[in-house]
């Protein structure tokens, strides 16, 4: 399958490498790899970004060992971050809307490919809607992100309300946003 990378005129083939140039003329190379399930559905397993000099700058790896608790490893430059994206067992919301999880399009370097993610050019979305993103090591600031969905009478997602809760030294602060969807 061939998918068009929507920045510039380059083309990507699944399980391949894409190269693009930013406005400053820097070349960035992205390599994608996929987990293919028994139904021949592709799930993005890894994206790696390399700079002009061939040095790895960033990556995201998604472990699908448990589809209700996806393990995400992210590295950007020298910063590494691991988290778990969960949906409660027995209370799953089937992703019949086939939308990607918001955290996927928020994490660099995948944030550079949001249109391709929504277009399913970079693989299928999770089978269940993710309801919580929990960092492994919160350090000084405890943080969780909770996702709440509004569905229409067909079970199609019409909105996702995300709340990022930071707790530091007993002080709580929430950052909220709502993304509305129109799916015909």
Regions found by a protein language model. Give the residues of each.
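A short, structured loop/turn motif at beta-sheet edges
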Residues: 10, 34-39, 65-66, 149-158
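Short helix-loop boundary/capping segments
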Residues: 47-122
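Single conserved hydrophobic/aromatic residue that forms the stacking wall/gate
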Residues: 1-8, 12-15
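Hydrophilic extracytoplasmic domains
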Residues: 119-123, 138-184
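Hydrophobic alpha-helical segments, especially N-terminal targeting/anchoring helices
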Residues: 21, 50, 63, 135, ...
């Amino acid at each position: 399958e061939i998918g068009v990378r929507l920045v510039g005129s380059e083309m990507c083939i699944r399980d391949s490498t894409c190269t693009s140039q930013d406005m400053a003329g820097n070349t960035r190379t992205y390599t994608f790899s996929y987990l293919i399930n028994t139904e021949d559905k592709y799930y993005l397993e890894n994206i790696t970004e390399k700079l002009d000099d061939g040095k790895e700058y960033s990556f995201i790896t998604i472990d699908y060992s448990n589809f209700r608790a996806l393990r995400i490893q992210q590295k950007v430059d020298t910063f590494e971050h691991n988290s778990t994206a969960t949906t409660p067992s027995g209370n799953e919301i089937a992703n019949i809307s086939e939308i990607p999880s918001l955290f996927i399009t928020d994490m660099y370097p995948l944030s550079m490919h949001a249109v391709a993610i929504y277009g399913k050019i970079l693989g299928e979305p999770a089978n269940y809607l993710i309801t919580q993103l929990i960092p492994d090591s919160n350090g000084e600031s405890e943080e969780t992100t909770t996702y709440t969905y509004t569905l229409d009478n067909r079970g199609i997602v019409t909105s996702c309300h995300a709340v990022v809760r930071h707790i530091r030294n007993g002080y709580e602060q929430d950052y909220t946003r709502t993304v509305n969807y129109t799916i015909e």
